[in-house]
A protein has these predicted regions:
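Bacterial N-terminal signal peptides
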Residues: 4-14
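Beta-sheet-rich non-transmembrane sensory/scaffold domains
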Residues: 17-675
Length: 675
């Protein structure tokens, strides 16, 4: 199913094309695209178009798509995709606070909380429940003595009515904040925005805004610019002063006829209250004519220079869809499931034969160029916040992990033997698949796969699902799970011949993997125990939060060298919902880790003593521990308790480590303590 988005690239390279560009000047800064040779274009390829062709395409799809009925969302609800990641920013010195965890070093990600050597910035709800509109700056105290933060100053962000602040970027060198706000036209379901992915018109009235704020060390916060964009925010990235955002929208103008211009169907931009203009020029758009699930959704690639006094931007767009993206420091890859799938509650059910399209654009400041598209078997998984982790780039080669099972719920799967006498398992039974893609003549060609005829060993056991995955250089790490946690190490040094180097089986699973150095991984997930029922013994119940230290220095023999279990069944950690929900600081061979958790370990009257017993809520806290990299051991420190005593949703909780202090954020409320 195509899930079109806008990809907004907000760039801060002042030297590009001599300064400010208006929307009408967009095409002047575009790089040359690379398309397949005639006859080599595949059904997933994008192609150049013109204003007439684009208008015809959009009007044709508008006629059919607008007939779709919007169904009650509670039955088909998914949250807006989260742009996810999980790398680490090592501390430069003890006076540097912990930073947002990142998937790619040097590719920053937005979050509710940002910090530098002097201040912690947060985007907070107003006390009168008007929404998350307040930018607060707290002064960090000295290394010893009272660790409590002091409020330095505040600024009510100038978002439009109905737009809520969602995240921040901090440019410490320029003393600049970029605050992002969003407005959803979807329904509200609890704390998650609910959108029906299969009713494109639900995306028609979305809005995204960027507010720029000067943040001098001595002086007050001051808003300097407001950029209003048509479209729903899906995710963002930043390289230096260049901010990259992904949005999705649907034409608001449904009038079809000769008097309607194609720009009437395209998203708009307004800067500092100026009149609305087209965000992207038709000549900068591409179409996916081979898409059988065509819709009028548009993905726009926009670059805005944030380092200049005057607004400047460039833009691209393509029709089709994207449900996830991954970005390196040079390229962005946009992926979407090709076949239609249904929803079961808030998780998808994929078609039996599913594949995923991937589109590549190169990035160079305000310049963006289409480099080709590819298609891989399988899908990127069931959880939106893990999909970007399924992709990774190394030396220009893209690695993609997909899975083959059609639904989230555990099932009993019997492998299909190819040859009973040799007990060789059918490659199709592998829960995970690795595809290796390289750019070739305007396409992304598959040059290597796992499993394959030469290396048929499956990635995971029958019935398992992919959980954590992480690409680091010429190594890949992934976790599958049903009861035990098989960690696989992949050798990606030869693109045409990837291989499994080793595996490790331990109880439970990891949702995220964080590299601590070249030989140690930190895994965070859940423990699990067997259900005790007859069968293959691989069905189990998850328990408390599990933290594992995994030695991968010998790739063929990975070892779990230490572990921690937090709470009982029902315990949750923010990092399991959002990879930014963990603070990791690495300094002089010592690692400090702080993660907000909601601990459940209170027995209840309906428990029966079995592994499925769900414990009652006990307390909220920031759980703290250290990792000795040379000894490969955990040391638990005293937790920092929350000032909020009742059970609550912890998805927005954060922690910041600063010297011998730890600061615990809970939706605008700070609790501070010593390490």
């Amino acid at each position: 199913m195509r899930f079109p988005l806008y990809l907004i690239l907000i760039s801060a390279l002042a030297a590009c094309s001599g300064g400010s560009k208006s929307p009408a000047d967009v095409s002047e800064v575009l790089l040359k695209d690379i398309f397949p040779l005639s006859g080599d274009a595949l059904q997933w390829s994008l192609k150049a178009t013109n204003e007439t062709e684009l208008k015809s395409y959009l009007e044709k799809t508008l006629v059919s798509a607008d007939k779709i009925q919007i169904v009650p969302p509670i039955l088909s609800a998914v949250g807006l995709p989260i742009a996810t990641s999980a790398g680490l920013s090592g501390a430069k010195s003890s006076s540097t606070p912990s930073q947002t965890t990142l998937q790619e070093a040097g590719v920053d990600e937005a979050d509710l909380v940002k910090a530098d050597a002097s201040f912690i910035y947060s985007i907070d709800p107003l006390p009168n429940s008007e929404g998350r509109l307040m930018l607060n700056r707290h002064k960090l105290g000295p290394s010893s003595g009272n660790p409590n933060l002091s409020l330095s100053d505040s600024l009510r962000l100038g978002f439009s009515k109905g737009v809520q602040g969602s995240s921040l970027y901090l440019d410490s060198d320029r003393k600049q904040i970029a605050a992002i706000g969003t407005q959803s036209s979807g329904w509200s379901y609890g704390r998650m925005p609910v959108i029906d992915w299969f009713a494109p018109t639900a995306w028609r009235n979305g809005a995204t805004e960027v507010v720029l704020v000067n943040a001098p060390t001595s002086g007050s916060l001051k808003q300097t610019r407001q950029i209003k964009l048509g479209g729903h925010l899906v995710g963002s990235r930043r390289i230096g002063a260049t901010l990259y955002m992904v949005l999705r929208s649907y034409p608001q103008n449904l009038t079809i006829g000769s008097a309607t211009k194609v720009t009437d169907y395209l998203p708009t931009i307004s800067v500092d209250g100026a009149a609305l203009q087209s965000l992207v020029e038709p000549s900068a758009c591409l179409v996916q004519s081979g898409n059988a699930n065509a819709s009028a959704d548009i993905i726009t690639v926009l670059a805005i220079d944030l380092a200049t006094e005057k607004h400047a931007h460039a833009a691209r767009c393509f029709t089709g869809g994207t449900e996830a993206f991954y970005m390196s420091d040079q390229n962005i890859y946009l992926a979407t499931t090709r076949t239609v799938y249904a929803m079961s509650g808030d998780v998808p059910q994929y078609a039996a034969e599913t594949s995923t399209d991937i589109h590549k654009f190169s990035l160079q400041g305000l310049n963006m160029a289409y480099r080709g598209s590819g298609n891989v078997k399988g899908h990127l998984g069931f959880e939106q916040n893990r999909k970007s982790f399924r992709m990774g780039e190394f030396n220009g080669t893209l690695h993609v992990l997909t899975e083959t099972r059609t639904n989230w719920f555990p099932t009993l799967v019997v492998p299909t033997p190819l040859i009973a006498a040799t007990n060789v398992v059918n490659i199709a039974d592998s829960p995970g698949r690795l595809s290796v893609l390289q750019e070739k003549q305007g396409t992304l060609a598959i040059v290597g796969e796992l499993p394959n005829a030469k290396r048929p060993e499956p990635i995971g056991k029958p019935g398992e699902r992919l959980y954590a995955s992480r690409f680091m250089g010429n190594r890949g790490y992934l976790v599958t799970y049903r009861l035990i946690d098989p960690l696989y190490i992949l050798d990606l040094s030869e693109p045409t011949d990837p291989k499994i180097l080793g595996s490790l089986e331990v109880s439970g699973y990891s949702d995220y993997l964080f590299p601590l150095n070249d030989g140690l991984l930190l895994g965070v997930g859940k423990d699990a125990i067997s259900d005790g029922l007859p069968g293959d013994g691989r069905m189990g119940w998850y328990q408390g939060v599990k933290v594992a230290l995994i030695d991968v220095s010998q790739s063929s023999k990975p070892l779990e060298v230490d572990r921690l279990i937090v709470g009982k069944r029902g315990t949750d950690a923010t990092v399991l919902q959002d990879h930014h929900g963990i603070a990791i600081q690495i300094l002089n061979g010592q690692v400090k880790v702080a993660m907000p958790v909601k601990v459940h370990q209170t027995p209840t009257s309906y428990m029966n003593g079995g592994p499925s017993d769900y414990y009652g809520f006990s307390w909220n806290e920031t759980y703290k521990f250290e990792v000795n990299l040379s000894q490969k051991k955990f040391t638990v420190r005293n937790s920092l308790p929350s000032s909020l005593k009742s059970e609550r949703w912890i998805g927005n909780d954060r922690a910041v480590i600063y010297m011998d202090q730890v600061h615990y954020y809970q939706d605008g409320i700070w609790v501070s303590g010593t390490w």
